[in-house]
């Protein structure tokens, strides 16, 4: 299990591509930046943004 991490900018987008794969994701900067850049988030948080 990967520990929660701060993911910002390109790192955040790369992580979403890895987690969501072919499903793709919806990028809502305000929500996900608040959740994953300002605070650490985990893989389950990222999965909430997959399509």
From Swiss-Prot:
**Gene3D superfamilies to which the protein is assigned, alphabetical:** Insulin-like (1.10.100.10)
SMART domains attached here?
IlGF
The lineage's top-level taxon is Eukaryota
Respond yes or no to whether keyword Secreted is given for this record. Answer: yes
**GO biological process, any:** glucose metabolic process
A GO MF term: hormone activity
Q: How does it assemble?
A: Heterodimer of a B chain and an A chain linked by two disulfide bonds.
The name of this protein is Insulin
